[in-house]
Structures are given as C-alpha cells and as structure tokens.
C-alpha cells in the first residue's frame, strides 16, 4: 500500500489500572523516584525486548540500522490514583515511559514508545509510517497484549507445522 518506508513510529499507551497486578508492579507503580531508578539499574523494571522489537521492525521494513538506543523514565502521579492493585499518591511513580530507537548513521529510522501507567491518558496504539503515501493507523484503546500474544501463537501454528526445522523469526 506504500512505497519505501523512511521512518516508522509506533506508540502504545496503556492504563495499567486495567491490567494485572504483576504488570503494575513491573512498571514501578507506587515507587519513589529513587526506588524506580534502583530497580531500573537492576533490570527489574520495564518492558523486556523493546530494543529487539525496534531492530526486528527495521529489518521487516528493509531499513538498514547500525545502532540502537533505549531510555526508561518514570511517569509520576499528578494526583492520587486509585484503582488497580493499590493506590498511588501524588508524586509517586504511576508507571513508566520507555523508548527504543533504531538508527542508521546517527539518523533515527524506527522509534517505539511505550507508556504503561496507572491513569495513563488516552490508551491506544498509533502506528505512523513516513512513506509514499504517509500512513497513520490509530487503534483507540489499543490491542490487549495478552490476547494479542495468544492470537499470534494460534495464527502462526499452521506456518510453524509446515516449516523446515530450525530457528525462525516472526518475519518468516
């Protein structure tokens, strides 16, 4: 539906109040800023694999990338937030904002942004392609991750059973 893609941006915003307690804790809800960054340093906060997803996205779009960067920052509660597994007081961490970028010679080619926080505004998924023509897809509310994973497995099963032995990626 389009020509060559020059840049891709994917944004996902999730209101963690609608998700299981384990995810709420994984994004740092209820922590202080210091506690949040301590767990970041230990690799215990954030979405695992976002940089790898950026690399896979670049590969699938035919973009040559030679460097990848990632940033993880807290989202703070601007007011007390109730709902979910616990109450988050104003000023505490409500969740996280994580960004992964794929670069080609210093130029950003793919940007993935993930915000998961209690009370996050306007949950949803947005996909934007800088191509000819430009494409923007908005999914209000977003696609629930657990359900999407189950659908991916079911839809991949016929191709997996018909494939040759060996390691495959989602691109194959």
Feature map (PLM): residue ranges:
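Active-site-lining helix/loop region of Rossmann-like oxidoreductase modules
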Residues: 2-125, 136, 150, 155
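C-terminal helical cap and adjacent loop that interface with cofactors, partners, or active-site loops
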Residues: 118-172
């Amino acid at each position: 539906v389009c020509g060559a893609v020059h840049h891709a941006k994917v944004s996902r915003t999730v209101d963690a109040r609608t998700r299981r307690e384990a995810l709420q804790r994984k994004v740092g809800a209820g922590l202080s800023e210091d506690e949040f960054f301590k767990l970041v340093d230990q690799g215990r906060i954030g979405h695992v694999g976002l940089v790898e997803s950026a690399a896979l996205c670049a590969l699938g779009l035919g973009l040559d990338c030679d460097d990848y960067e990632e940033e993880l920052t807290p989202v703070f509660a601007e007011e007390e937030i109730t709902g979910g597994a616990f109450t988050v007081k104003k000023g505490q961490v409500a969740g996280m904002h994580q960004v992964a970028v794929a670069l080609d010679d210093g130029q950003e080619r793919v940007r993935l942004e993930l915000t998961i926080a209690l009370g996050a505004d306007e949950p949803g998924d947005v996909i934007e392609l800088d191509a000819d023509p430009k494409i923007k897809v908005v999914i209000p509310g977003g696609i629930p991750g657990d359900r999407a994973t189950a659908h991916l497995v079911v839809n991949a099963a016929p191709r997996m059973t018909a494939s040759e032995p060996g390691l495959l990626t989602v691109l194959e």
